């Protein structure tokens, strides 16, 4: 059977395989034809991630099926990103240097570190659990607000791009502000 394998960036190839082939074997073929290293490939069929140790027949992949390839960054690139961020105390020291003399900035930073350590020692497990609960609740509210905001922005773009007729465009802006205000009220 023939499978069409597509990269998100538009490259594609057609591969002849049997249903008895493993996903790992398919990854090798994809690597040869599309020059995507096997360890960077995620293969998807109908939105389902294919496991390397399974066979194509396990996913009921038939002739003329289409497999999507998503490239994940190499693991060493992910490690580089984590090392690029500066520690809090270094960043704070740089900010203090801008506003104080070098000696004063070092003294203030020392006091801040000492106070930070003292407060960490006084924190109870209950207080940490409460803080985590609040942060998770805020994160969920932010995600809900983003989900509500995305369709509103899309509909406003449609109106501004000729979908709304000749209303001058001011009505769309007012509606967006009202939705923002409603979202803020819901957050409180």
Curated annotation (Swiss-Prot):
One of its GO terms (cellular component) is cytoplasm. It comes from Mus musculus (Mouse). InterPro entries: Ubiquitin-like_dom (IPR000626), Ubiquitin-like_domsf (IPR029071), Ubiquitin_dom (IPR019956), Ubl4_C_TUGS (IPR041421), UBL4B (IPR043317). Residues 1-76 form the Ubiquitin-like domain. This is Ubiquitin-like protein 4B. May have arisen from retrotransposition of the X-linked Ubl4a gene during mammalian evolution. Gene3D superfamilies: Phosphatidylinositol 3-kinase Catalytic Subunit, Chain A, domain 1. The keyword Iron-sulfur does not apply. It holds the Pfam family ubiquitin. Expressed specifically in post-meiotic male germ cells of the testis. Abundantly expressed in stage 14-16 spermatids. Residues 161-174 have a biased composition (Gly residues). It is found in: Cytoplasm. Keywords: Cytoplasm. PANTHER family: UBIQUITIN-LIKE PROTEIN 4B (PTHR47905:SF1). Residues 146-188 are annotated as: Disordered. Transmembrane segments: none annotated. The keyword Lipid metabolism does not apply.
